[in-house]
Amino acid sequence: MESSMNNAFIMSKHETAMFTDDQNPEESSWTMYFEDFFEASSSIVDVGDFSSSSVSDAASFVATKKTLNVSKQEGSNLDIKRTRNREIPFGRHHDLEDTASSPSGSPNVYSMMNLQDNNTRHGGGIVGDDEKRVSAVPNQGGLPIDLKKKGLCLVPLSMVTNFLG
């Protein structure tokens, strides 16, 4: 076990020796891209002294980068208006609900589960089995209206492919 670890250590030393002076094993192609970019724009931005090890990724360098020459007067002329948050009535915008974390707690899922339980308790597995049930549900074009409001309409696959294609 120990000899295999020594072999791996020797192998890793051998692999690091294969890199040239321009490359380090921890450098990525992004590092060279950023170095070239900052060298080209060094007359505009004072970036100070940096090496490839100090710029390991884009996020670390953003915090240390000095801003462009922007005076305080130009900054005070900016007109930033806050957008007013509109209150969204509960139950009207179903697509804005967070159902990824708790789908069973969603009002849509809960009401649909109750609808399914009521249908199976009364002997009907599918809404619209009988003519009585079809006449009890208000129809428009053969589909129940409340399903259209929820966006649960059946669409032929050919229409979807024609729409997307």
Swiss-Prot record:
Involved in the regulation of plant growth. GO terms for biological process: multidimensional cell growth; xylem development. Plants overexpressing VUP4 exhibit severe dwarfism. InterPro entries: VUP. Signal peptide: none annotated. It comes from the Eukaryota. It comes from Arabidopsis thaliana. This is Vascular-related unknown protein 4.
